[in-house]
Amino acid sequence: MNDMSRIVLCNFKSQNLQCYVTAEVKGGILLISGQDFSIAGEQLFGDSEYEYFYSLNKEDTEKLKTILGERSFRKALKENFSGLDGCKTFREICEMNGLRYEFNSYCG
C-alpha cells in the first residue's frame, strides 16, 4: 500500500470536551492518533490532556483495506471511523476480523 497523507477523522469541540483524531499511512502502516481534552480527564487523572495511538502492521493494514471494500482507502477510513465513536468502531472491526492493532496512550 502506498503512503497516505494525514486525514482528520474527528475535530469536535464542546464546553466539556475537545477531540482531535487523525489517520495516515506511512510505510504501509496505518497510524491513528488522537488527542482529547476533557474536564473528566482532569478530574480522573489530574490532567485534561489524553493522547492515544493505534497502529496496524502492513499485513493487517492491507486486510483492513479489503474488509472496508472501498477503492479509496482514504474515503473508507473517513466513512467508517469519523466522529467521536470512530476509534471504538475501529477497535470493533479489528477485533471482529482478527486484526492485531497496537495501542499506546498517556495523560499530560
Please give the residue ranges for each predicted region.
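Low-complexity intrinsically disordered segments
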Residues: T61-G108
